[in-house]
Each structure stands twice: as structure tokens, then as C-alpha cells.
Amino acid sequence: MATEIEVHFPGDVQVEAHIRGFVISTDQPEKSGGNNSAPSPFELFTSSIATCAGYFAVKFCRARNIDTAGMSLKMAYDWDKESKRYPKMSVELTLPEGFPEKYRGAIIKAMDQCVVKKHILEAPEFEISAVYSSEAPNR
């Protein structure tokens, strides 16, 4: 069965995604006509990359009984005005105290397993359509 996300429009330019019983709210910054009440869709997209890498870092440490206290991750990206996109995104993991040097390369490889990033590198086909409510399947 396909995974489905139901999207609702609560007002202004706010958009909500409903998935697995969770509600993910988005908005736009004021300069883009929003109320800045939630992250923008692009901020959620980039956050999903960062949190996915973080998940794999934590999973790596847990499998080796390495304490994650003090471990942190940040992701940075800069806008390129000419290409009108973010040409590079950098993920940096700050290792916890006592992290074994022998695992530094391995934890990077673990973070590289992020499924979100893999879907960017091997992009799925996107199919976009519009239907009238009378044509939509019953939900």
C-alpha cells in the first residue's frame, strides 16, 4: 500500500501535512507573505536531511555502546543568487568526548546512508495532477 500524505490549508499561506497521525505545519516568513508561525517547506526539507543524518549517527553509536552525550550536528547551506538555489549543503557532526578515532570515518559513512539524501541523489519520478472533488477517489 502506498504511503499517503493528506494536505490541508488552515489559512493564509499556512499548509499542514497529515501523516501517520502527525500534523506537520508549515508557513512562510513574513517577507514571503506568511506569518512566520512555522518553518517553511524548504526548511522542513533541509531539516529532514539533517535529522536523517543525525539518526544514522545515533544508530551507529548505539550499536557500539558509545555515549552520545555532547554529540551534536549542524547543517549549513548558502543561497547562490546567480543560480537561484543552494548549490552545496554541509553536514558537520561534533563527536562526543571519548569518541574512538578509529570510528571517525565509519560514522561519516553511516550518516551517508541517509535515505532522504539518497532520494535527492537518485530522484524519484514526480507525477503532479489536479482533479475536481467529484473526480477524486473516496477517502
Language-model features: locations:
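Alpha-helical metal-binding/catalytic segments enriched in His/Glu/Asp
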Residues: C52-A53
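Extended beta-strand/beta-hairpin segments
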Residues: M1-S47, A57-R139
